[in-house]
């Protein structure tokens, strides 16, 4: 099993099914014997490979879609009110129900944004460390302290880890930017006019 960035995650050791026999998730034995559970919606299946999409990525797509839809619905509701196509009482009732859903999604999105920023920080630290090791190996090679074969060994050890981290960082950055675009800087709804 690999993630969408190409990193090996381990081997599948168990499959979870619901009462109807549908796939619910899999258990993966990761490095060090750690058992990790992946939900079915995270899995991409091909004849030769199972690919795992990070949960944050799926959640971000869902939340972005839901927040965008809720904003459109609130805007449409206000438009109906402004053109007097609905009564004030119905407007207030519908607006209150939309606001509750919107506020809940905003809170969920803010929590997801915070966890994505934390992951981005972790990845940034790992990329920085690996890049430093790679630069030091190249520096040692240029100064004659490290032979060509040792440099290739160092590069062969570092680069397969570095490239997926860079891909994940770029993916996280893009998803975070899109998520923050749909998050309001502050939440306001125009006062009720009847």
Feature-to-residue mapping (PLM):
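Peripheral interaction segments used for macromolecular assembly
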Residues: 1-187, 191-193
């Amino acid at each position: 099993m690999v993630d969408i960035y190409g990193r090996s995650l381990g081997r599948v050791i168990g499959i979870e099914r619901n009462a109807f026999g549908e796939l619910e998730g899999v258990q993966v034995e990761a490095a060090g014997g750690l058992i990790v559970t992946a939900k079915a919606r995270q899995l991409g299946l091909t004849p030769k490979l199972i690919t795992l999409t990070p949960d944050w990525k799926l959640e971000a797509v869902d939340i972005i879609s839901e927040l965008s839809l809720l904003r459109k619905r609130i805007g449409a509701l206000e438009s109906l009110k402004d053109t007097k196509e609905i009564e004030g009482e119905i407007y207030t009732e519908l607006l209150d129900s939309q606001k509750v859903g919107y506020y809940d999604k905003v809170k969920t999105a803010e929590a997801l944004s915070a966890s994505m920023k934390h992951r981005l920080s972790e990845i940034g630290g790992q990329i920085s460390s690996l890049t430093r090791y790679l630069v030091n190996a190249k520096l040692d090679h240029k100064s004659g302290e490290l032979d060509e074969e040792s440099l290739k060994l160092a590069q062969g050890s570092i680069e397969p880890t570095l490239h997926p981290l860079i891909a994940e960082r770029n993916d996280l950055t893009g998803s975070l930017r899109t998520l923050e675009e749909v998050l309001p800087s502050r939440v306001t709804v125009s006062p009720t006019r009847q």
